[in-house]
UniProtKB/Swiss-Prot annotation:
PROSITE patterns: HTH_ARAC_FAMILY_1, HTH_ARAC_FAMILY_2. This is Raffinose operon transcriptional regulatory protein RafR. InterPro entries: AraC-bd, Homeodomain-like_sf, HTH-like, HTH_AraC, HTH_AraC-typ_CS, Tscrpt_reg_AraC-type_HTH. The keyword Transcription regulation applies. SMART domains: HTH_ARAC (SM00342). Keywords: Activator, DNA-binding, Transcription, Transcription regulation. GO terms for molecular function: DNA-binding transcription factor activity; sequence-specific DNA binding. Residues 193-214, 241-264 bind DNA. The keyword Transcription regulation applies. Involved in the regulation of the raffinose-operon. Residues 176-274 form the HTH araC/xylS-type domain. It comes from the Bacteria.
Length: 277
Protein backbone atom coordinates (compact mmCIF):
# COMPACT_ATOMS: atom_id res chain seq x y z
CA UNK A 1 0.00 0.00 0.00
CA UNK A 2 1.06 3.57 -0.63
CA UNK A 3 0.11 6.20 1.88
CA UNK A 4 1.00 8.77 4.50
CA UNK A 5 0.09 9.44 8.11
CA UNK A 6 0.91 12.60 10.03
CA UNK A 7 -0.02 13.96 13.43
CA UNK A 8 -0.55 17.66 14.01
CA UNK A 9 1.01 19.50 16.93
CA UNK A 10 -1.10 22.61 16.33
CA UNK A 11 -3.53 23.15 19.21
CA UNK A 12 -4.98 26.52 18.19
CA UNK A 13 -8.72 27.14 18.01
CA UNK A 14 -11.43 25.10 19.64
CA UNK A 15 -11.71 22.54 16.83
CA UNK A 16 -8.41 20.70 16.61
CA UNK A 17 -7.14 18.43 13.89
CA UNK A 18 -5.15 15.63 15.50
CA UNK A 19 -3.89 13.76 12.45
CA UNK A 20 -4.39 13.29 8.74
CA UNK A 21 -3.29 10.88 6.04
CA UNK A 22 -3.92 9.09 2.79
CA UNK A 23 -3.95 5.44 1.70
CA UNK A 24 -4.17 3.52 -1.56
CA UNK A 25 -5.39 0.18 -0.25
CA UNK A 26 -4.61 -3.32 -1.49
CA UNK A 27 -7.50 -5.54 -2.62
CA UNK A 28 -9.68 -6.65 0.32
CA UNK A 29 -7.55 -4.63 2.75
CA UNK A 30 -9.21 -4.32 6.16
CA UNK A 31 -8.02 -2.05 8.94
CA UNK A 32 -6.89 -4.30 11.80
CA UNK A 33 -6.02 -1.73 14.45
CA UNK A 34 -8.19 -0.50 17.32
CA UNK A 35 -11.51 0.19 15.65
CA UNK A 36 -12.91 2.12 18.64
CA UNK A 37 -11.44 5.59 18.69
CA UNK A 38 -11.45 8.63 20.95
CA UNK A 39 -11.62 10.99 17.96
CA UNK A 40 -13.73 11.62 14.86
CA UNK A 41 -12.11 10.62 11.56
CA UNK A 42 -13.64 11.74 8.25
CA UNK A 43 -12.58 9.81 5.13
CA UNK A 44 -13.04 10.99 1.55
CA UNK A 45 -12.91 8.23 -1.10
CA UNK A 46 -10.82 9.40 -4.06
CA UNK A 47 -10.82 6.22 -6.15
CA UNK A 48 -12.33 2.73 -6.15
CA UNK A 49 -14.84 1.37 -3.70
CA UNK A 50 -15.25 -0.65 -0.52
CA UNK A 51 -17.61 -1.72 2.25
CA UNK A 52 -18.24 0.32 5.38
CA UNK A 53 -20.26 -0.37 8.51
CA UNK A 54 -20.56 1.31 11.91
CA UNK A 55 -22.18 -0.15 15.02
CA UNK A 56 -25.99 -0.10 14.78
CA UNK A 57 -25.76 0.78 11.08
CA UNK A 58 -26.05 -1.72 8.19
CA UNK A 59 -23.04 -2.37 5.97
CA UNK A 60 -23.03 -0.36 2.75
CA UNK A 61 -20.87 -0.17 -0.36
CA UNK A 62 -19.24 3.23 -0.83
CA UNK A 63 -17.31 4.48 -3.85
CA UNK A 64 -15.29 7.40 -5.15
CA UNK A 65 -16.99 10.69 -4.25
CA UNK A 66 -18.49 9.38 -1.00
CA UNK A 67 -17.34 10.18 2.55
CA UNK A 68 -17.63 8.24 5.78
CA UNK A 69 -16.84 8.99 9.39
CA UNK A 70 -15.41 6.85 12.17
CA UNK A 71 -17.26 8.28 15.18
CA UNK A 72 -15.79 8.52 18.65
CA UNK A 73 -16.35 5.38 20.73
CA UNK A 74 -18.08 3.49 17.90
CA UNK A 75 -16.82 0.17 16.49
CA UNK A 76 -16.47 0.37 12.71
CA UNK A 77 -15.57 -1.99 9.87
CA UNK A 78 -14.27 -0.94 6.49
CA UNK A 79 -12.76 -3.05 3.73
CA UNK A 80 -11.41 -2.29 0.27
CA UNK A 81 -13.08 -3.94 -2.70
CA UNK A 82 -11.31 -6.91 -4.30
CA UNK A 83 -11.44 -5.61 -7.88
CA UNK A 84 -11.45 -1.84 -7.35
CA UNK A 85 -9.80 -1.20 -3.96
CA UNK A 86 -10.35 2.29 -2.71
CA UNK A 87 -7.96 5.13 -2.17
CA UNK A 88 -8.93 7.73 0.41
CA UNK A 89 -7.61 10.52 2.56
CA UNK A 90 -8.69 11.18 6.12
CA UNK A 91 -8.68 13.94 8.71
CA UNK A 92 -8.98 13.14 12.43
CA UNK A 93 -10.63 15.67 14.75
CA UNK A 94 -10.41 15.86 18.53
CA UNK A 95 -13.51 14.64 20.35
CA UNK A 96 -14.40 17.85 22.18
CA UNK A 97 -18.00 18.69 22.96
CA UNK A 98 -17.93 21.54 20.43
CA UNK A 99 -17.01 19.11 17.65
CA UNK A 100 -19.71 16.72 18.83
CA UNK A 101 -22.27 19.52 18.92
CA UNK A 102 -21.48 20.59 15.36
CA UNK A 103 -21.48 17.03 14.06
CA UNK A 104 -24.74 16.19 15.80
CA UNK A 105 -26.53 18.70 13.60
CA UNK A 106 -25.44 16.94 10.41
CA UNK A 107 -26.75 13.92 8.56
CA UNK A 108 -23.18 12.59 8.57
CA UNK A 109 -23.45 11.92 12.31
CA UNK A 110 -26.71 10.00 11.82
CA UNK A 111 -25.78 7.86 8.82
CA UNK A 112 -21.97 7.86 9.23
CA UNK A 113 -21.61 8.40 5.48
CA UNK A 114 -22.69 10.75 2.68
CA UNK A 115 -22.85 9.86 -0.99
CA UNK A 116 -21.44 11.73 -3.98
CA UNK A 117 -20.20 14.94 -2.42
CA UNK A 118 -17.42 15.43 -5.00
CA UNK A 119 -19.14 18.26 -6.87
CA UNK A 120 -20.24 20.26 -3.85
CA UNK A 121 -19.04 22.28 -0.89
CA UNK A 122 -18.05 19.34 1.31
CA UNK A 123 -15.40 17.99 -1.05
CA UNK A 124 -14.07 21.51 -1.66
CA UNK A 125 -13.82 22.08 2.10
CA UNK A 126 -12.16 18.74 2.83
CA UNK A 127 -9.75 19.05 -0.09
CA UNK A 128 -8.64 22.54 0.85
CA UNK A 129 -8.33 21.62 4.52
CA UNK A 130 -6.22 18.58 3.66
CA UNK A 131 -3.99 20.74 1.47
CA UNK A 132 -3.50 23.40 4.17
CA UNK A 133 -2.61 20.73 6.74
CA UNK A 134 0.57 20.07 4.77
CA UNK A 135 1.74 23.68 5.18
CA UNK A 136 4.14 24.36 8.10
CA UNK A 137 2.61 25.99 11.17
CA UNK A 138 2.48 29.76 11.37
CA UNK A 139 0.04 32.23 12.87
CA UNK A 140 -1.58 33.03 9.54
CA UNK A 141 -1.88 29.35 8.61
CA UNK A 142 -3.35 28.55 12.03
CA UNK A 143 -6.01 31.20 11.43
CA UNK A 144 -6.68 29.78 7.97
CA UNK A 145 -6.88 26.25 9.37
CA UNK A 146 -9.41 27.32 11.98
CA UNK A 147 -11.58 29.07 9.41
CA UNK A 148 -11.54 26.03 7.10
CA UNK A 149 -12.56 23.70 9.91
CA UNK A 150 -15.54 25.86 10.78
CA UNK A 151 -16.46 26.23 7.11
CA UNK A 152 -16.50 22.45 6.75
CA UNK A 153 -18.89 22.03 9.66
CA UNK A 154 -20.96 25.00 8.49
CA UNK A 155 -21.45 23.33 5.11
CA UNK A 156 -22.25 19.97 6.72
CA UNK A 157 -24.96 21.68 8.76
CA UNK A 158 -26.22 23.72 5.82
CA UNK A 159 -26.28 21.12 3.06
CA UNK A 160 -26.73 17.91 5.06
CA UNK A 161 -28.81 18.82 8.14
CA UNK A 162 -29.73 16.08 10.58
CA UNK A 163 -33.19 14.97 11.54
CA UNK A 164 -34.55 17.63 13.92
CA UNK A 165 -35.48 14.95 16.46
CA UNK A 166 -31.85 13.89 16.81
CA UNK A 167 -30.72 17.49 17.26
CA UNK A 168 -33.21 17.91 20.09
CA UNK A 169 -31.92 14.76 21.79
CA UNK A 170 -28.32 16.02 21.57
CA UNK A 171 -29.34 19.38 22.98
CA UNK A 172 -31.03 17.62 25.89
CA UNK A 173 -27.87 15.61 26.57
CA UNK A 174 -25.80 18.80 26.69
CA UNK A 175 -28.25 20.45 29.05
CA UNK A 176 -28.29 17.43 31.37
CA UNK A 177 -24.50 17.35 31.40
CA UNK A 178 -24.39 21.04 32.27
CA UNK A 179 -26.86 20.63 35.13
CA UNK A 180 -24.94 17.64 36.49
CA UNK A 181 -21.71 19.65 36.44
CA UNK A 182 -23.29 22.48 38.43
CA UNK A 183 -24.86 20.08 40.92
CA UNK A 184 -21.53 18.36 41.51
CA UNK A 185 -19.32 21.46 41.59
CA UNK A 186 -21.28 24.44 42.93
CA UNK A 187 -19.69 24.03 46.38
CA UNK A 188 -16.19 24.37 44.92
CA UNK A 189 -16.73 27.95 43.79
CA UNK A 190 -17.07 27.09 40.11
CA UNK A 191 -18.18 29.79 37.70
CA UNK A 192 -20.27 29.74 34.53
CA UNK A 193 -17.07 30.23 32.55
CA UNK A 194 -15.70 27.08 34.19
CA UNK A 195 -18.81 25.28 32.93
CA UNK A 196 -18.32 26.73 29.43
CA UNK A 197 -14.74 25.50 29.36
CA UNK A 198 -15.76 22.08 30.68
CA UNK A 199 -18.38 21.65 27.95
CA UNK A 200 -16.38 23.56 25.32
CA UNK A 201 -19.44 25.72 24.60
CA UNK A 202 -19.80 29.47 24.27
CA UNK A 203 -21.57 31.37 27.02
CA UNK A 204 -24.29 32.54 24.63
CA UNK A 205 -24.99 28.98 23.44
CA UNK A 206 -25.09 27.75 27.05
CA UNK A 207 -27.58 30.49 27.94
CA UNK A 208 -29.81 29.51 25.01
CA UNK A 209 -29.57 25.87 26.08
CA UNK A 210 -30.84 26.68 29.59
CA UNK A 211 -33.58 29.01 28.37
CA UNK A 212 -34.79 26.33 25.97
CA UNK A 213 -34.84 23.44 28.44
CA UNK A 214 -35.52 25.13 31.78
CA UNK A 215 -36.57 28.73 31.05
CA UNK A 216 -33.79 29.98 33.29
CA UNK A 217 -30.15 30.96 32.99
CA UNK A 218 -27.09 28.95 34.07
CA UNK A 219 -26.21 31.64 36.62
CA UNK A 220 -29.67 31.52 38.18
CA UNK A 221 -29.49 27.75 38.55
CA UNK A 222 -26.00 27.97 40.06
CA UNK A 223 -27.21 30.59 42.54
CA UNK A 224 -30.27 28.50 43.42
CA UNK A 225 -28.18 25.40 44.10
CA UNK A 226 -25.87 27.32 46.40
CA UNK A 227 -28.51 29.21 48.31
CA UNK A 228 -30.90 26.30 48.76
CA UNK A 229 -27.99 24.38 50.24
CA UNK A 230 -27.19 27.39 52.42
CA UNK A 231 -30.79 27.55 53.69
CA UNK A 232 -30.59 23.89 54.63
CA UNK A 233 -27.32 24.38 56.48
CA UNK A 234 -28.55 27.50 58.26
CA UNK A 235 -31.60 25.64 59.53
CA UNK A 236 -29.86 22.41 60.58
CA UNK A 237 -26.41 23.42 61.87
CA UNK A 238 -24.64 25.91 64.11
CA UNK A 239 -21.93 26.67 61.58
CA UNK A 240 -21.04 30.32 61.19
CA UNK A 241 -22.30 32.33 58.25
CA UNK A 242 -18.73 32.56 56.95
CA UNK A 243 -18.31 28.78 57.13
CA UNK A 244 -21.58 28.14 55.34
CA UNK A 245 -20.66 30.69 52.68
CA UNK A 246 -17.45 28.75 52.01
CA UNK A 247 -19.28 25.41 52.03
CA UNK A 248 -21.63 26.46 49.23
CA UNK A 249 -19.00 28.08 47.02
CA UNK A 250 -18.74 31.71 48.13
CA UNK A 251 -15.33 33.17 48.98
CA UNK A 252 -16.56 35.77 51.46
CA UNK A 253 -19.54 36.25 53.73
CA UNK A 254 -20.41 39.70 52.34
CA UNK A 255 -21.03 38.44 48.80
CA UNK A 256 -22.88 35.44 50.21
CA UNK A 257 -25.09 37.53 52.50
CA UNK A 258 -25.95 39.93 49.70
CA UNK A 259 -26.91 37.07 47.37
CA UNK A 260 -28.83 35.27 50.11
CA UNK A 261 -30.91 38.35 50.98
CA UNK A 262 -31.69 38.97 47.32
CA UNK A 263 -32.76 35.33 46.94
CA UNK A 264 -34.73 34.78 50.14
CA UNK A 265 -35.68 38.28 51.26
CA UNK A 266 -33.71 38.06 54.50
CA UNK A 267 -30.09 38.05 55.59
CA UNK A 268 -28.57 34.70 56.62
CA UNK A 269 -28.55 35.72 60.28
CA UNK A 270 -32.16 36.90 60.24
CA UNK A 271 -33.25 33.79 58.34
CA UNK A 272 -31.62 31.60 60.97
CA UNK A 273 -33.30 33.52 63.80
CA UNK A 274 -36.68 33.37 62.10
CA UNK A 275 -36.67 29.58 62.22
CA UNK A 276 -35.48 29.45 65.80
CA UNK A 277 -31.84 28.42 65.39
Amino acid sequence: MNGEYKTLANKSFESNVLFFGQEACLPNYTYKGNNVRDSYVIHYIQEGKGTFAAANHPATVLKAGDIFILPKGTPCFYQADNDQPWKYFWIGFSAGIRIEAMLSGSLLAQKCYLRQVQNGHIYADLSELYKVLHIPNSLINDVLLGSLIYRLFYDLLRWYPADATNIKVKSTEQFNLAVSYLQENYSTGCTIMDLCHYLNLSRSYLYTLFKTHANTSPQKLLTKLRLEDAKQRLSTSNNSVQSIANMVGYKDSFTFSKAFKRYSGASPSYYRKSIGI
